[in-house]
Amino acid sequence: MQELIKRTLPQDDALNQAIVNELRSQNWAGFLNYSQVQQLCHNFELTPLKLAMHLLPLAASYSHTAISHFNVGAIAIGEQGDFYFGANQEFANSAIQQTIHAEQSAISHAWLRNERRISDMVVNYTPCGHCRQFMNELHGAEKISIHLPHSQNNPLHSYLPDAFGPKDLDIAAHLLAEENHDLVADHQDDLVNQAILAANQSHCPYSNSPHGIAILFKNGDVVTGRYAENAAFNPSLPALQTALNFAYLNDKKLSDIERIVMAEKALKLSHKTMAETLLSTLTSVELEYYSL
């Protein structure tokens, strides 16, 4: 990742050098907190939006696009000014529905870092309909601004007029809000407990079938993922995808996976088979499944 980032950001530029130094200090995690953003903006006389635009090729470098070879980068800006990178993640030898879009990537990245509200989405290509619908699930969706290289300060709902969303199904819950499904993490295995805790934070008001993923890497690091459901159903994002996406954006190698645990309360639907199918194309490590 280090060399890819350096190729993306030519190191004969002082701003690029400063960005690389920030990323190096955090092991190449695709994230800049508010303080880092403000320092870069101050040092190089930039607005946060101009900095985000400059960072789009960098965000896109986190993509995995074995199918399309079309890299999309996105940056979700949290309400306190943190920058969450996102990139499209494709999975060869699996169903195309397993794909993670760049805006989904950035939002789920923010969610797993416990962001509660997105104010702006900066992306290098116009959001597709799938992503517009996914963003409409967010708390405060009507206030989100979309920024493209050729057009800034566009309300999300200008891309999604007469929008269908949670309110049409009498659902008050929104993605990124605090969730609690009363799932108890009392297993003897800590990795199972982490999967249960992730499931407990799922956003699944339509099926009430939460599930979570916990991935243990060989160095002892653990990455978790939560299920993000959508009013339109198909733009929903399973927990395995949110976990894999977070791993990619934090420079984790799937070859270093040691264990993968899934905890699920399958009331109306289950993601077990879908997760096993995708994992079989990525790793020889088998899914450990726990029914809640």
Curated annotation (Swiss-Prot):
Essential cofactor(s): Zn(2+)
Cofactor, free-text remark: Binds 1 zinc ion.
Keywords, in A-Z order: Hydrolase, Metal-binding, Zinc
EC assignment: 3.5.4.5
Name this protein carries in UniProt: Cytidine deaminase
NCBIfam families assigned to the protein according to its UniProt record, in alphabetical order: cyt_deam_dimer, PRK09027.1
Assembly behavior: Homodimer.
Keyword Metal-binding (UniProt): yes
Source organism superkingdom: Bacteria
Annotated residues for binding of substrate: 88-90
Ranges for domain CMP/dCMP-type deaminase: 47-167, 186-292
Record-listed Zn(2+) binding positions: 101, 128, 131
GO terms classed as biological process: cytidine deamination
Similarity-based family: Belongs to the cytidine and deoxycytidylate deaminase family.
Biological function: This enzyme scavenges exogenous and endogenous cytidine and 2'-deoxycytidine for UMP synthesis.
Residues annotated as the enzyme's active site: 103 (proton donor)
MF (Gene Ontology): cytidine deaminase activity; identical protein binding; zinc ion binding
Class of enzymatic activity (EC top level): hydrolase
Gene3D superfamilies the UniProt entry points to: Cytidine Deaminase, domain 2 (3.40.140.10)
Reaction(s) catalysed (UniProt annotation): cytidine + H2O + H(+) = uridine + NH4(+); 2'-deoxycytidine + H2O + H(+) = 2'-deoxyuridine + NH4(+)
UniProt keyword Metal-binding, yes or no: yes
